[in-house]
């Protein structure tokens, strides 16, 4: 499988990686088999997170005896220095390893949070640097869903990799973020290649991403058949045919008016409604086990705030994609109520 240099990390990673969210839904034995199949097919980049319940532990078991053949990336949400240190040690224990190749700040979507991380006196970046000096982590990365924040993160030159949503509908990174990553020699990791499950044509999705030679893509894998299909795409013809381009344009037209990119330009909401979280709730249902979102410390509280909508329409006036936000909020909340009732 083709490998590329992951920016200034210098790591030679496969262009096709592994995303560790879906294996939470599997039995441990099946999860281990899926990860090991990825390794057998040549995939050498595995992504997970402290918050993905059983994912780290299952990856740790899957790579037993093959640790030095793979690169493991995991992440932590920002917190206090003590919390970061505890999360890192927990990840090392779960993964059954004494080092993590890339440790990432998870979901940094605004300048204020980034500024706190990079504060020269008390920033959490210092905790990561300390861990790097101790040999617990080898490279420092960051993940984001918000373009303005992502640009600042790249321009800071403090991080070696960035992970960001990218697919042929959420295609803004092609012009706005990838050129910046090239300029700063920053590794670019693609999340949401299938738009969180909204796109179902794997061939189109991955052939589109194969047009960007510096991109490492980490689809969430749940079945052996999925990784076999995607690996075959990466080994096959990479040029997009006229017929495929036509299908792509049709799907953009069909989904573009109902697809939240989580840019959060609709915010702030006077009622404190987490708009993008509620509108993208259907992707949680598709990708995650119910306990993950129903017992989350913040998702149920956020979903309930949908009832506070006053229908003012301010969010819709700010949306650069002209989404019917008020209608989509109702749909997201109704789905939440259905899932909650089914899992009582």
Q: Where do the PLM segments sit?
A:
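Local beta-strand N-terminus motif with an aromatic residue
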Residues: 13, 46, 69-70, 97-100, ...
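Conserved, mostly hydrophobic/aromatic
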Residues: 6, 18, 38, 46, ...
